[in-house]
């Protein structure tokens, strides 16, 4: 197993790695829409939060030698299912033609008042 840490995504805030690579698979820990450069925790629109979170996932995947086009499955936690339209539109734009398996999990609350958290599993290139 290899732990992945990159400055291009938010530093892990607890006892975990940003990702683990094992047997050619990258397991990305749940990511929030925190700006890795400034650690800014400003909550923007759901579209802004979704894009920032996906970019954090992407940065970790790249550090692991993978990318969004190698994602096998994503789990998206959203604080209000009514936000799904904005999440899905942004997700489709960022992911492009690649359509990995996906689960959407409505939850009551997420850290720091955010409305989205994304976890991913990807193949390494």
Residue ranges of predicted features:
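Short, polar/acidic, helix-capping and beta-turn segments at strand->helix junctions
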Residues: 1-125
């Amino acid at each position: 197993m290899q732990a992945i840490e990159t400055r291009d995504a938010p530093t892990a805030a607890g006892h975990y790695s940003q990702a683990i690579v094992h047997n050619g698979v990258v397991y990305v820990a749940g990511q929030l829409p925190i700006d890795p450069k400034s650690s800014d925790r400003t909550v923007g629109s759901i579209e802004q939060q979704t894009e920032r979170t996906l970019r954090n996932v992407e940065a970790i995947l790249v550090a692991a030698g993978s990318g969004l086009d190698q994602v096998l499955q994503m789990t998206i936690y959203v604080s209000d299912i009514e936000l799904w339209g904005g999440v899905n539109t942004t997700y489709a734009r960022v992911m492009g033609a690649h359509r990995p398996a996906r689960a959407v999990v409505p939850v009551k609350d997420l850290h720091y008042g955010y409305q989205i958290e994304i976890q991913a599993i990807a193949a390494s290139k």
